[in-house]
Amino acid sequence: MGKLTLDITMSLDGFIAGPNQTMEQPLGEGGERIHEWVYGLKSWRESHGESGGEATADDEVFAETFSSTGAVVMGRRMFSGGAGAWEDDPNADGWWGDNPPFGVPVFILTHHAREPVTKEGGTTFTFVTEGAGGALAQARAAAGDKNVAVAGGANVVQQYLGLIDEMQIHIAPLLLGDGVRLFGGPERPVLEATRVIESPAVTHIRYRVVK
């Protein structure tokens, strides 16, 4: 069985999204800037079915994470930005497009049941109403010997924080000042930094969670 991992980008002041999130601006004001480091990478473009891109140290980090992940868990808002009944969600099939960048089974925490949604490239979105434990059990079964990655959002991260084995935080060199904090709940895991990779665009820090 693989590890339960957290792999996520945040601003230098600890935010994973800016303030005033909307359906039209899911990452809030300024939130897109947090992820600018990834858009031009060769492995990122390949995961979207595109060619070209830069083969840098950042690209190696992204590709390594992509290849070691066998399943993903995320929240409803990260999937579509919506809440409530699916028939009332204008992004009911998600805002990840026809060929999402995951290429593995993705399990969505939700209070509203529905049939799975299958996309191109090996991504199937399964909607789990049995809570965080139920989603993790299904994700582990799907991942086999590979890792299960917790993708977000912040509320979902908090639900799994006591179970996560390893974190990789990509710190973007910018300050948002306000928005959605990654860490704000009562859990305070003990962390040991095991790797730091720096580039002008982002700093990648891997932590082992001491248990």
Region spans (language model):
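Enzymes that bind and transform nitrogen-containing heteroaromatic metabolites
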Residues: 1-211
